[in-house]
Amino acid sequence: MDTCHIAKSCVLILLVVLLCAERAQGLECYNCIGVPPETSCNTTTCPFSDGFCVALEIEVIVDSHRSKVKSNLCLPICPTTLDNTEITGNAVNVKTYCCKEDLCNAAVPTGGSSWTMAGVLLFSLVSVLLQTFL
């Protein structure tokens, strides 16, 4: 597989996160989707006061190639996590960090963070399979 497949996998994961996400109000969060990890993100006010700011760091490994992107956004819940997952033979690691304070999702903290959202990966697998057949 080449970097095109890596990019498609990352985009699909991020698209699913966006489709599954409702925004929260009142909380101020950083907001960017599928950008390189060193990229600065804009801020946004979330629609519901009980929302979470979420930071995702997504790494897709195809053969010996690694690709990382980050997403920062508002979600109504903190996503459930697992350890590591494989989608169509590719290793996908998603570090997730959730918080409930203004602008607390600047980055996924190093060490001790959780990995891989189960729902996102399930929907991503379906999306990848659908895209394969289209």
UniProtKB/Swiss-Prot annotation:
Gene3D superfamilies: CD59 (2.10.60.10)
Lipidated sites in chain (GPI-anchor amidated asparagine): N105
Main localization of the protein described in the UniProt heading: membrane
InterPro entries recorded: CD59_antigen_CS, LY6_UPA_recep-like, LY6H/LY6L_nAChR_modulators, Snake_toxin-like_sf
Record-annotated UPAR/Ly6 domain positions: 27-118
A Pfam family this chain is assigned to: UPAR_LY6
Signal peptide: 1-26
Annotated Gene Ontology cellular component terms: external side of plasma membrane
Intracellular or extracellular location(s): Cell membrane
Tissues showing expression: Expressed in bone marrow.
Positions of the propeptide segment: 106-134
Membrane protein topology class: Lipid-anchor; GPI-anchor
Disulfide-bond pairs as recorded: C29-C53, C32-C41, C46-C74, C78-C98, C99-C104
This protein's name: Lymphocyte antigen 6G
Gene: Ly6g
